[in-house]
Design a protein with these regions (language model features):
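Carboxylate-rich, polar loop motifs that coordinate divalent cations or form catalytic acidic clusters
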Residues: 1-240
Length: 240
């Protein structure tokens, strides 16, 4: 299979069979305004890239290139949006933009629609995932769990008076494990774990134990085939 790597100031890389392939989507001089920023590999194998400033791109394996989508079928633009995160949602792709926009794009009908998030106005959207039949949105003002079918939004925030609340309001990453638990990475509060039974978080932060985290600044979370959770940090490497 392919290993995909996004380096915002350089471009998109694909590694396969000891060969490294490079895809330069935008002008190098514009990398600060037009840069690849996130990736979604759908269940059918399609690879989609979300950009700052350039909309979204889909990988075409037939000619080994990316096809840019700058607007929907009605002319609503994607160009100019800063897309921080992208995930699969049935026939849709959900995108979290740092302007405080949560939008979805239908890959079949090519329609773009807004997803309203009550209480999440005027905040920075960092990451989005579709887990347990709901949309999970990480922001710089907590976590929002959205049920579109029921038109319901649950807001989860840091609360110093509640020991089982989030440890930090700034959410950077999310991951669902094979047991249905959800891991939340924060900017200043380490890792939060939400078991598959309630909305009370367990917390993992730096401590005196040799098996504890080395930092509270969490960037990425992922589970491997053995069930191990890999934790990428901002300033202390990787923990497992």
């Amino acid at each position: 299979g392919n290993i995909w790597v996004i380096i915002p100031d350089q471009g998109i890389f694909r590694y396969k069979d000891n060969e490294l392939y490079f895809y330069e989507i935008s002008n190098r001089r514009q990398f600060k305004q037009e840069s690849p920023n996130c990736i979604c590999v759908r269940e059918n194998g399609e690879v989609w890239i979300g950009f700052w400033g350039l909309g979204i791109c889909r990988y075409n394996p037939q000619n080994d290139s990316f096809e840019q989508i700058v607007e929907d079928r009605d002319g609503r633009p994607l160009v100019g949006k800063n897309i921080n995160s992208i995930c699969e949602y049935g026939d849709w792709l959900i995108m979290a933009a740092n302007e405080g926009e949560l939008i979805k794009y239908n890959t079949k009908s090519h329609v773009l629609e807004d997803i309203k998030v009550a209480g999440a106005d005027n905040t920075f959207y960092t990451t989005v995932a579709y887990m347990k039949g709901k949309i999970w949105l990480g922001t710089f003002n907590g976590l929002y769990v959205i049920d579109e079918k029921k038109n319901e939004v649950v807001s989860l925030k840091e609360d110093l008076m509640r020991s089982f609340s989030l440890s930090d309001k700034m959410i950077y990453s999310m991951c669902q494990d094979s047991e249905g638990g959800i891991w939340i990475g924060t900017l200043f509060g380490g890792v939060n774990y939400l078991p598959n039974r309630n909305l009370q978080f367990d917390k993992f932060v730096p401590g005196s134990s040799g098996n504890s985290l080395n930092t509270k600044r969490i960037r990425e979370l992922a589970e491997d085939v053995k069930g191990n959770i890999w934790i990428g940090t901002e300033d202390a490497g990787i923990s497992v």
